[in-house]
Amino acid sequence: MSVSVMEAIKEVKLAEEQAVKEIEEAKNRAEQIKAEAIEEAKKLIAEAEEEAKKLVEEMIKKAEEEAKKEAEKILEETEKEIKEIISIAKVKILSLKLSEILEI
């Protein structure tokens, strides 16, 4: 009986050692998975930041283009109004000159 008890103790010890070894391997694998997940997350964050940067740049460019178009439109309208005012002023000046001539 002592031989089988000794064998049982050896088997238990071997099983315990194997379990400890498997636990350590599982811990190592978990650390590896964690490190890989962190690296993947860093890549995803960098990609998201790049996408956001591109989106913001596109939005800024679009806003600048719209502002430029609006400024050009305002400038055209202002120039048109200036021309109209000049035309009206010329007509009034000519009318005044004509009335002065008619008075003479």
Curated annotation (Swiss-Prot):
**How does temperature shape the activity of this protein?**
Optimum temperature is 80 degrees Celsius.
Keyword field: ATP synthesis, Cell membrane, Coiled coil, Hydrogen ion transport, Ion transport, Membrane, Transport
- Which topology term describes how it sits in the membrane? Peripheral membrane protein
The pH profile of the activity is: Optimum pH is 6.0 for ATP hydrolysis.
InterPro entries xrefs: A-ATP_synth_H_N, ATPase_A1A0-cplx_hsu
Coiled-coil ranges (or none): 54-104
The record lists the membrane-crossing segments as none
| Broad class of the protein's primary localization | membrane
**Subunit:** Forms a boomerang-shaped homodimer with arms about 12.0 and 6.8 nm in length with 89% helical content. The N-terminus contacts subunit E. The C-terminus contacts subunit A. The A-type ATPase is composed of subunits A(3), B(3), C, D, E(1 or 2), F, H(2), I and K(x).
About its domains, the entry says: Purified ATP synthase is 25.9 nm long. The hydrophilic A1 domain is 9.4 X 11.5 nm, the central stalk is 8.0 X 3.9 nm and the membrane-bound A0 domain is 6.4 X 10.6 nm; the domains are connected by two stalks. ATP is synthesized or hydrolyzed by the A1 domain while ion translocation occurs via the A0 domain.
Q: What does this protein do?
A: Component of the A-type ATP synthase that produces ATP from ADP in the presence of a proton gradient across the membrane.
Protein name per its UniProtKB record: A-type ATP synthase subunit H
